[in-house]
Regions:
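Low-complexity, Ser/Thr/Pro/Gly-enriched N-terminal "stalk/linker" regions
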Residues: 4-123
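Generic recognition of long tandem-repeat/solenoid scaffolds
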Residues: 236, 415-419, 503-511, 567-569, ...
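Beta-strand-rich recognition/accessory modules
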Residues: 579-642
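Acidic Ser/Thr/Pro-rich low-complexity disordered segments
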Residues: 45-57, 449-459, 627-629
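Extended polysaccharide-engagement surfaces of secreted carbohydrate-active enzymes
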Residues: 282-587
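Aromatic-lined, polymer-binding surfaces characteristic
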Residues: 77-272, 284-308
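Short amphipathic alpha-helical coiled-coil/interface segments
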Residues: 126, 174-178, 273-280, 329, ...
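Surface-exposed polar/charged interaction patches
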Residues: 7, 11, 15-18, 22, ...
């Protein structure tokens, strides 16, 4: 009786927040009512792509998506209880939304004539998860994620097995779900800021209403509030602006709109999703990798979620006669898939984070990252991508391969630039618990993205961006640009960006009022790599340049050679060359022990330079032509000792 009273009291309280205290948001400054600031980039790149020469095909087809998805399904089928729940093979418990994800995954595979022997497992997962959410017993209180998966799984199974009595059982349970009991992320008098959890719950409620098993009150109210969290670029801003949860939130909305959502906010959401899809394609690196930064960075599903969103966007562009972008989105999806394959495990499942450490080590994991739920999330993204894929759309050059442009994205404190197969990501004011201010990543077509550099450790622990530190007097402490993040008074601006003579030039200016220092970085992106010049104004005795040298991902160990001010790294037939051009620079030296970071282990390589200016280059060398995508490049004859 006490439990019932408590549940009823909570329901009344939540309903008070939902209805009695609901305040209609002021949408006059929402992103969808403002102009798209990067529309000119979209148009310029369209012209660039239309003039580009054809590139060799990736060879990726939708069956490849299904092959990986099926491998994951078969792996986790071995860990299903008799009662239907999916148990994590590492922790031996049910995590979050693993069970409803598994139900949808196998249903989607069955729809594509895959894994018929697993259909019983899907029914068991559907019944177990629907029973859990109906009785507010979702695993680890993650009920917000259940209906998005369960309603779609039920729709597929009902179409294939319309007379199965289990349909009625699952329908009855889903119909009984009370949103204010089942979900954690709700509008209440105490909670006015929503996040990605509520996007997913709202999408589940849309699908439930379309299936005739619910009503639209919940999703109408919450999606209206969610419109405030989109920028004019169509990007979703989760608390603290992690890059990964922008596309994550849009993925769920994209899938939901394919289900013919006709609610009050369809046009506004659709506009945001179209802009966001363009931004994601423009932000993609020449290695097919999504931008990184912030919480949950370097998780494999960050790249996988590009695939269904790009497949949907390809169809949308094709239907409008925009064949240039339709083909670019198609190839972008394939590049994203190709970048993911390296993280497959021989057991058929995926590494959760982009390294080859054993899952038991949880290397690079967030506290909420688990092998089961994130592997199965990746699998449903791939299976849905296959569902949305139109194989009649051919590949065409992508912006990162054949375009030249710069994106200034202040909501995520990022500047991203691509120039004909060379791409960089700059964090303008980092969340230093995760990243560092300055240059985060350099990717080139045909190169190994992990050598990139691809990621950096948290600057709070190890300031190790490709960047500068200075000291004000001999023997003084080194002050790193990377450490000047959200908690400091640093001010950053993209001072200039233009393209001429085959080079894209970007100038970044960082001002630190509290110390009186101004750091100016000039980047020159060329076909062969990046040249960078740095000048530090203010009290400066000497500079140190730091470089995060990747030393292991748990499986592959690059060969590393340092000769004076030149660092060469090679792995799997590709080579990276980092060299300091400034005269008077001390020889490069490895500092300290290796440091754990998301991609494995990294060591800091440094050089000290007298004065206040420094210049360096980062170039891609290729020891052998790469199969697959992109353009392999041989810069010159590199050391035979590598």
């Amino acid at each position: 009786m006490q439990k019932i009273i408590g549940r009823v009291s909570r329901r009344v309280w939540n309903l008070a927040g939902e209805v009695m205290h609901y305040r209609k948001p002021d949408l006059s400054k929402a992103g969808y009512v403002r102009a798209f600031p990067h529309q000119h980039v979209v148009e310029t790149v369209r012209h660039q792509l239309s003039k580009s020469r054809p590139l060799s095909g990736t060879g990726v087809i939708k069956d490849d998506y299904l092959d990986v998805a099926e491998g994951i399904a078969r792996f986790f089928a071995k860990y299903q209880r008799e009662t239907g729940e999916i148990i994590d093979p590492i922790d031996q418990i049910e995590h979050q939304y693993s069970t409803p994800c598994f139900a949808l995954l196998v249903a989607l595979l069955h729809k594509h004539d895959r894994a018929p022997d697993l259909i019983g497992y899907a029914w068991n997962a559907l019944l177990a998860a629907s029973n859990a959410i109906c009785h507010t017993r979702a695993a680890e209180n993650h009920g917000d994620f259940y209906l998005f998966n369960l309603v779609q799984a039920l729709d597929i199974l009902q179409e294939i097995y319309p007379s199965d009595i289990r349909i009625g059982v699952a329908e009855g349970r889903i119909r009984k779900v009370i949103a204010t009991d089942a979900y954690r992320c709700l509008l209440t008098p105490q909670r006015r800021r929503l996040d990605n959890w509520n996007v997913i719950a709202s999408c589940g409620e849309v699908l439930r209403e379309q299936a005739g098993l619910g009503n639209g009150g919940f999703h109408d109210r919450h999606l209206e509030q969610q419109l405030l969290h989109f920028t004019e670029d169509g990007m979703y801003v989760d608390p603290k602006s992690p890059m990964i949860y922008d596309l994550y939130s849009r993925f769920f909305l994209e899938v939901t709109l394919q289900g013919q959502y006709a609610g009050r906010h369809r046009d506004a959401i659709n506009l945001m999703l179209e802009r966001g899809a363009y931004m994601s394609l423009l932000m993609q690196s020449p290695a097919g990798v999504a931008p990184s930064g912030g919480e949950a960075k370097q998780h494999t599903w960050a790249d996988i979620q590009q695939i269904p969103v790009f497949e949907i966007a390809a169809r949308r562009c094709e239907s409008r006669g925009d064949y240039v972008y339709a083909k670019a989105f198609k190839r972008g999806a394939h590049l994203a898939f190709a970048s993911t394959i390296r993280w497959m495990r021989t057991s058929g499942d995926l590494h959760v984070v982009k390294n080859h450490m054993h899952p038991e080590n949880r290397h690079g994991y967030e506290s909420y990252s688990h092998h089961s739920q994130y592997s199965l999330l990746s699998a449903i993204m791939l299976a849905l991508a296959a569902d949305f894929s139109d194989e009649s759309i051919d590949e065409g050059p992508t912006p990162c391969e054949a375009g030249s442009y710069t994106l200034d994205i202040p909501a995520f404190h990022k500047v991203i630039a691509n120039h004909h197969g060379t791409g960089i990501v700059i964090d303008t004011k980092a969340e230093t618990r995760y990243d560092g201010t300055g240059l985060l990543r350099v990717h080139q077509a045909g190169g190994d993205p992990i050598l990139g550099p691809n990621d950096v450790p948290p600057a709070d622990d190890y300031p190790m961006n490709i960047g500068v530190a200075w000291r004000e007097f001999p023997g003084g402490d080194w002050v790193h640009l990377a450490s000047h993040g959200q908690h400091t008074d640093i001010k950053t601006k993209l001072a200039a960006s233009d393209s001429s003579d085959g080079i894209r030039t970007i100038t970044m200016v960082y001002t630190i009022p509290s110390s009186g220092h101004t750091i100016t970085e000039r980047y020159e992106l060329a076909l062969t790599g990046v040249n960078v010049s740095i000048n530090v104004d203010g009290a400066v005795d000497a500079l140190t340049l730091t470089y995060p040298c990747h030393v292991s991902d748990g499986k592959l160990f690059p060969q590393i050679l340092i000769e004076g001010t030149v660092l060469q790294m090679s792995i799997d037939g590709t080579m990276r060359t980092f060299s300091i051009i400034s005269p008077g620079a001390a020889p490069l030296a490895i500092q300290g022990e290796k440091v754990a970071y998301r991609n494995g282990y990294v060591q800091c390589v440094t050089s000290t330079i007298p004065g206040r200016a420094i210049q360096y280059s980062l170039m891609e060398g290729s020891l052998s032509a790469l199969a697959g995508f992109g353009v392999g490049r041989v810069v010159n004859q590199l050391s035979n000792n590598i």
